Amino acid sequence: MSAQKPGLHPRNRHHSRYDLATLCQVNPELRQFLTLTPAGEQSVDFANPLAVKALNKALLAHFYAVANWDIPDGFLCPPVPGRADYIHHLADLLAEASGTIPANASILDIGVGANCIYPLIGVHEYGWRFTGSETSSQALSSAQAIISSNPGLNRAIRLRRQKESGAIFNGIIHKNEQYDATLCNPPFHDSAAAARAGSERKRRNLGLNKDDALNFGGQQQELWCEGGEVTFIKKMIEESKGFAKQVMWFTSLVSRGENLPPLYRALTDVGAVKVVKKEMAQGQKQSRFIAWTFMNDEQRRRFVNRQR
């Protein structure tokens, strides 16, 4: 009897418990990280970043046809089920204009990261095309290595370096380009000290000492920015006005519900025509993303049906 994970999107492939026997066949290195729970059930040693990376390799290969995936030490190793949820809810948002999920949607991933996780899932699940932006040259190199080592991805995913300090869409969205949606997992903390404290809490909760689990740290640009998440998303909202006719839906994850009111005020200030909040849940973890558009219903219908 497989237990259901509460709250995952109906199309998410990860509702059931992990089939560890199958995943170990897909990626044999996962076997060394298996442990037994107090109840005597087999599990993965989630406190070990190498175990989490091995699990991700197996999940991406088994469910998303990504045979070759790796990230450098010190970069965030994302939980696949939660990342897939964002993609599926985004698909529902894109379907509202025409009643069907567009098969040839063009998506911009702000901060694609070393793991390239959102494009990998979106290409496999919906056949979408992605542009991924990134400030870190090391993260960009890692993402490009993943794309280049998996057949077919070069045609579906392209990467761009954000060279302008503090810019989000400026310099990334070119003059004649159009995107059905943007997505983003913004940096959460407002300082390096806060980011370190957050990583330390995570280590303590997992029973690790200070030197363990470097992968739970993440790189500076992944974890914090001046002013934290609210300031980052406000900047995104401000810039989005300049691309109101080139992008149908702008979206971003918001880690805490209390961060929403100042963002709603910012969206009112820039004249967003429609604002949507999508609630998500993975186990005990609650998350959400907000979406906004400068197009009315008819304009969105025309945008979806445009020549591509």
Curated annotation (Swiss-Prot):
Can you cite an annotated GO cellular component? Answer: cytoplasm
Per UniProt, the keywords (alphabetical) are: Cytoplasm, Methyltransferase, rRNA processing, S-adenosyl-L-methionine, Transferase
- Into which EC class is this enzyme placed? transferase
Judging by the UniProt lineage, the source's domain of life is: Bacteria
The record ties this protein, via Gene3D superfamilies, to: Vaccinia Virus protein VP39 (3.40.50.150)
Q: Which InterPro entries match?
A: METTL16/RlmF, rRNA_lsu_MeTfrase_F, SAM-dependent_MTases_sf
Q: Name one GO biological process term.
A: rRNA base methylation
Classification via PANTHER family = RNA N6-ADENOSINE-METHYLTRANSFERASE METTL16 (PTHR13393:SF0), SAM-DEPENDENT METHYLTRANSFERASE (PTHR13393)
| Described purpose of this protein according to its UniProt entry | Specifically methylates the adenine in position 1618 of 23S rRNA.
Any extra remark in the record? Recombinant protein is able to methylate partially deproteinized 50S ribosomal subunit, but neither the completely assembled 50S subunits nor completely deproteinized 23S rRNA.
Family, per the entry?
Belongs to the methyltransferase superfamily. METTL16/RlmF family.
* Name by which UniProt lists this protein: Ribosomal RNA large subunit methyltransferase F
Organism of provenance: Escherichia coli (strain K12)
Q: What is the lineage of its organism?
A: Bacteria, Pseudomonadati, Pseudomonadota, Gammaproteobacteria, Enterobacterales
